């Protein structure tokens, strides 16, 4: 509801809203005028369907520089590393932990930053729609649900998100092909690193249904001062094989997390580096965090803190 006071008996009102067509109404009466309910028509240009298709390059057949990582390789080599670090051995890919905090890794491909690398999960672009990059801390649980991971180096085109000038990374998650069974695992590492994970799958039933559930928690103190972290991850996949030619699957996954950070932009002078070495004592000076300290009650605090949850829901029809 709104009330407008006009100095003239003639006026033109314009109504605009994102996703709807503009509407113009003229007022020519004197005194109080009731416009009633103002209805805007949908703008078909902005609300049209987006069809996303994806495919995996075939080694020795597709004319693209490509590297494919199988789930066995990821499980054996990843350990307590972050997901992007598994690509360190891939030609043309540079992966680093930046400030060293949980989930703050970044990837450069052929020298290009993440803004020019298309990252997709099941063919759906994950790049941020505003700045084009990607925060890997939002997808901390992807390593536990990945069926295969493929990097394609070289120019690519995208109508939806970031242009893949440097290349593209396509991550395919588990679906109806999972065997019946389950597992519970616990991992631990240095600096209080802990990871608890469970996984269960029904396999495909006689009537074509399959369900896969996965959940876990990762927490620890971090290698760098004041980089404590805690993250949960979940994955749900419900699939139905209608016949030999059609299959429908619903997937939901996410990773609510928080972690303290260390900025990698605040460099130290030579004098400052010497002071840090004296301050840290026998500990490695590489652990020093200038944004870390203690509160009035002795609690550990950090000036840089990140807390986020970016769930993804998708419905796929394969034929």
Labelled PLM ranges:
Residues 14-21, 30-76, 114:
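Short, acidic, small-residue-rich periplasmic hinge/interaction motif at the N-terminus
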Residues 96, 156-160, 186-188, 223-225, ...:
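Outer-membrane beta-barrel domain signature
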Residues 140-185:
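A beta-strand signature from Gram-negative outer-membrane beta-barrel systems
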Residues 181, 188-219, 224-273, 304-318:
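Transmembrane beta-barrel wall of Gram-negative outer-membrane proteins
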Residues 27-32, 93-103, 161-165, 227-230:
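Short, glycine-/polar-rich solvent-exposed loops and beta-turns at beta-strand/coil boundaries
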Residues 3-5, 106, 125-153, 172:
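Short acidic/polar hinge/loop motifs at secondary-structure boundaries
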Residues 131-132, 151-153, 180-183, 217-221, ...:
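Extracytoplasmic loops and strand-loop junctions of Gram-negative outer membrane beta-barrel proteins
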Residues 59, 84-125, 141, 147:
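Extracytoplasmic beta-strand/coil segments of soluble accessory domains associated
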């Amino acid at each position: 509801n709104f009330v407008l006071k006009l100095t003239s008996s003639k006026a033109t009102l314009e109504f605009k809203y994102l996703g709807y067509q503009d509407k113009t109404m003229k007022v020519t009466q004197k005194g109080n005028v009731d416009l009633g309910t103002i209805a805007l028509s949908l703008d078909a240009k902005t609300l049209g369907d987006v069809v996303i298709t994806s495919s995996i390059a075939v080694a020795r057949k597709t004319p693209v520089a490509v590297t494919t990582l199988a789930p066995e390789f990821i499980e054996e080599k990843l350990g307590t590393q972050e997901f992007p670090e598994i690509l360190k051995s891939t030609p043309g890919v540079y992966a680093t932990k930046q400030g060293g905090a949980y989930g703050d890794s970044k990837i450069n491909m052929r020298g290009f930053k993440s803004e020019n690398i298309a990252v997709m999960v099941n063919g759906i672009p994950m790049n941020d729609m505003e700045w084009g990059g990607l925060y890997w801390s939002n997808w901390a649980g992807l390593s536990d649900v990945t069926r295969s991971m493929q990097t394609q180096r070289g120019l690519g085109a995208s109508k939806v998100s970031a242009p893949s000038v440097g290349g593209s990374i396509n991550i395919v998650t588990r679906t109806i092909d999972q065997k019946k069974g389950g597992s519970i695992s616990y991992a631990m590492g240095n600096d209080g690193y802990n990871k608890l994970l469970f996984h269960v799958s029904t396999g495909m039933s006689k009537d074509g249904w399959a369900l896969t559930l996965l959940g876990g928690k990762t927490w620890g103190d971090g290698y760098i001062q004041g980089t404590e972290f805690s993250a949960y991850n979940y994955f749900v996949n419900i699939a139905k094989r209608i016949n030999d030619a059609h299959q429908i699957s619903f997937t939901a996954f996410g990773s609510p997390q928080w972690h303290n950070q260390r900025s990698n932009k605040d460099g130290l002078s030579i004098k400052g580096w010497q002071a840090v070495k004296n301050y840290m004592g026998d500990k490695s000076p590489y652990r020093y965090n200038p944004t870390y300290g203690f509160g009035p009650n002795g609690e550990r605090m950090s000036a840089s803190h990140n807390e986020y949850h970016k769930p993804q829901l998708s419905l796929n029809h394969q034929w």
